Amino acid sequence: MAEQLYLENIDEFVTDQNKIVTYKWLSYTLGVHVNQAKQMLYEYVERKRKENSGAQLHVTYLVSGSLIQNGHSCHKVAVVREDKLEAVKSKLAVTASIHVYSIQKAMLKDSGPLFNTDYDILKSNLQNCSKFSAIQCAAAVPRAPAESPSSRKYEQSNLQAASEAQASELTTNGHGPPASKQASQQPKGIMGMLISKAATKTQDTNKETKPEAREVTSASSAGGKAPGKGSVMSNFFGKAAMNKLKVNLDSEQAVKEEKTVEQPPVSVTEPKLAAPPAQKKSSRKSEPGKVQQKEKSSRGKRVDLSDEEAKETEHLKKKRRRIKLPQSDSSEDEVFEDSPEMYEADSPSPPPVSPPPDPMPKTEPPPVKRSSGETKRRRKRVLKSKTFVDEEGCIVTEKVYESESCTDSEEELKMKPASAHKPPAAAVKREPREERKGPKKGAAALGKANRQVSITGFFQKK
């Protein structure tokens, strides 16, 4: 009865479940000895062949025997299909054993499925792998689970896999996984302290780089919006500040400013008076010094340097102005170009150490007094320069005539200080370092000069 039940089980495994049944798998599944499992498979094949239903079965055999190869005898064990069984037998000198290894419905192309079937069943029975085996050793004692090297390697591989999985987790919002999960895996003692310090340092550096990137983007956006706001002069100063923030474009902007300053303004109707050559040379020498000082200046002093350079550019513009002789309608305002007084009035402004006392035009005709001694108020056309930034980002200076009202006494006050405070030509050739210190000292000198002019004018009126 027992053998009949076993055969029914084998038939169910092969036909119904379409499994590959090996003698090892059958021994562990049914709990029988391996030799008994081999006999059960052999009987099942013989019974199916007698019933003429064995044509659907494919059988593999385990063959062992001695083989003479290269003049040496050796013992050979092979798993072969039924159609190659006779060929393997003929090669063996002595056949030791032949028994059924596996039964399956499909024909196998290689031994891969057989290996997988035995591997799975042996892995699930590692502690009792020799329980149903034909080879046993009474002196063999199994090791404890903690002492076996295979279990240690298995545990270490699990720990490494867990640590790699945690390391590969992506951080969310700049924060890593909770510290409680990593605490159990970090080594204790000094090594654990060093690892924790390194982790905190990396987090701090990541936090520091993010605000720096935000500051750079905000500065660039603010610099891009600055030139479009304010008046013409505010656009000019905003342009200079934006050039300092953009370090890569600093040299190019400086070259553009030099070119625009050196270009003389275009005259349409009136003749011009040429500036002295010494003044041009000094401006050309001072401009390369400014470019070098811009590159060497630190970031902390950019605001102060921008104010000073803005004043210096104003001085250069005042030096470069070409004053046109205004046309007056009245006969009293006629001006002669060949008179020496006009050349004195058209002389260049003082050096950048002391800025000019007044940006008003200096080519005004001498006052004309009536016979009765009364002053005459009149309107006259004055040539003024206007600066603005064009579409290409270059600074353009244009001169436009504007009408102003003035008296004869005011003209006298403006003419006399201009001729009295005429600077020597050698004073223009000063180093650019003195031009840096000029605006602060020049402010005090300007105030004193204005006070002196007002006092002298007061006495002259009386």
From Swiss-Prot:
Cellular localization per UniProt: Cytoplasm; Nucleus
Function recorded in the entry: Accessory component of both the DNA polymerase delta complex and the DNA polymerase zeta complex. As a component of the trimeric and tetrameric DNA polymerase delta complexes (Pol-delta3 and Pol-delta4, respectively), plays a role in high fidelity genome replication, including in lagging strand synthesis, and repair. Required for optimal Pol-delta activity. Stabilizes the Pol-delta complex and plays a major role in Pol-delta stimulation by PCNA. Pol-delta3 and Pol-delta4 are characterized by the absence or the presence of POLD4. They exhibit differences in catalytic activity.
Bias-annotated ranges (Polar residues): 156-174, 451-462
Phosphothreonine, modified sites: 407
Region (Disordered): 144-186, 200-230, 254-384, 403-462
Cross-link (Glycyl lysine isopeptide (Lys-Gly) (interchain with G-Cter in SUMO2)): 256, 259, 429
GO CC list: cytoplasm; delta DNA polymerase complex
Main localization category: cytoplasm
Record keywords, A-Z: Acetylation, Cytoplasm, DNA damage, DNA excision, DNA repair, DNA replication, Isopeptide bond, Nucleus, Phosphoprotein, Ubl conjugation
Motif PIP-box mapped to chain: 452-459
Cross-link Glycyl lysine isopeptide (Lys-Gly) (interchain with G-Cter in SUMO): residue positions: 256, 429
Domain of life assignment: Eukaryota
Post-translational modification: Ubiquitinated, but not targeted to the proteasome. Sumoylated. Sumoylation by SUMO3 may be predominant.
InterPro entries per the UniProt record, alphabetical: POLD3, POLD3_sf
This protein's encoding gene: Pold3
Biased composition (Acidic residues): 330-344
Comp. bias regions, Low complexity: 218-230, 416-427
Protein's UniProt name: DNA polymerase delta subunit 3
GO biological process: DNA biosynthetic process; DNA repair; DNA-templated DNA replication
Sites bearing N-acetylalanine, chain numbering: 2
Comp. bias (Basic and acidic residues): 204-215, 284-305, 428-437
Keyword Nucleus annotated: yes
